[in-house]
């Protein structure tokens, strides 16, 4: 629809049609034949009787005799009239264009009071001044705030083009003087004001139609979103149905007892360029120290442990790498292998306890933390041995925390590892404030510990402090750019504050670090399921079904580089 077209019919013909259809207008002085409406107005308007004048006064002073419903008027909020071109209203402006009923009623009362507060002559003079200002402009495509005073049309009618109306208004009216009749100039100006008001009313109706179309489009988006969400839910349901009874029993044991009843064996990558390399372990250590991709270092350590299954340090390094690489269960499997060879390995005990907390095996984690403290400070932990086999979660947590506090108070200086263990215990009990205090104390001793910065970020995120968490994750990534888990956690916090595109970029960056040059992608072994599922959620939040359908194990990340920076 063009800027100067509305309903496609002559304005005065519409006025005539409305008068014929509305019984409230078919009274003395408002009978109007269907032929030559413009000429009728020009030649017979001078014959205004007292009854006609009373009806006109009712129009101009907004007498209660004519309600908005009778005249078919729609209130026009002034906020809309001051928002620029009529076709310039955008979806994101819906907050100003879609006013509530209460707001509309308030505007209606204020306009009514403004009209009623003036005498008929004062109201006419004000309207004439407004019309004169408007007539000086060359375009009707934009609205001005000043128009809000007469923004409510006096009748529900139509206007087809400015050309027809301007042609009629340029004719010299032939009126004879009569008692109580408006002067020639005043009548033309008033009629012009009414015609302008009619045009405004039609413009607002067009805007309403556009709003309806936008609502239909938004409903379509909502339907697409619901369809995608239902599909994801269905996939989850299918996966749950495929779960065996034994797996259900394992999950039950996990959530009801907090103990790890069965740890799956380590899943090795089938394509490993470091296999049969006698220096695989050393290569892995060099890759870690130089900030190479964790997935590449993992391949080197995998080759080392397959070459020598009793290599304790290789199992330890492999477990450390995989937990940082957002492959928790593989990391736990490697660390368990390390502990089976060296039950008092302190780094393995601390790392695996944190992994068990992440996976929900709290009792097993508390047991590991207790073992770590006994192995590190045996002289300070001579309290009675905890019966871990016959104790509930609450009491085990309480006793282990008490031991850690005793050791922390007995030490002459802060031990960051004791603070880490104590903070992990508080974290498991969702006492995140205490956790944050412990981790910050540890960072005061070692501010360049990227792992501790990541753990601090996780604690802040769980305390609903996403912005601070993001800062902590960025600090961890500044110290170690290949830290995949920190990128994953950063994506979670970004989603929590509505930054879905930034979250997707962090996740895609994390997935890209799972790729190793000259090694084909082999699906779930290489790419973390957690990252893939979170990436799907970010695309759903972005309402990007086209991208969602591309997310799958082994996908080519190059297809996302044109739109995302990673």
UniProtKB/Swiss-Prot annotation:
Monoubiquitinated at Cys-5 by PEX2 during PEX5 passage through the retrotranslocation channel: monoubiquitination acts as a signal for PEX5 extraction and is required for proper export from peroxisomes and recycling. When PEX5 recycling is compromised, polyubiquitinated at Lys-17 by PEX10 during its passage through the retrotranslocation channel, leading to its degradation. There is a cross-link at residue 17 (Glycyl lysine isopeptide (Lys-Gly) (interchain with G-Cter in ubiquitin)). Gene3D superfamilies: Tetratricopeptide repeat domain. It is found in: Cytoplasm, Cytosol; Peroxisome matrix. Residues 6-28 are annotated as: Amphipathic helix 1 (AH1). Its main location: cytoplasm. Residues 88-159 are annotated as: Disordered. Residues 225-241 are annotated as: Amphipathic helix 4 (AH4). The TPR repeats mediate interaction with proteins containing a C-terminal PTS1-type tripeptide peroxisomal targeting signal (SKL-type). The WxxxF/Y motifs mediate interaction with PEX14, promoting association with the PEX13-PEX14 docking complex. This is Peroxisomal targeting signal receptor.
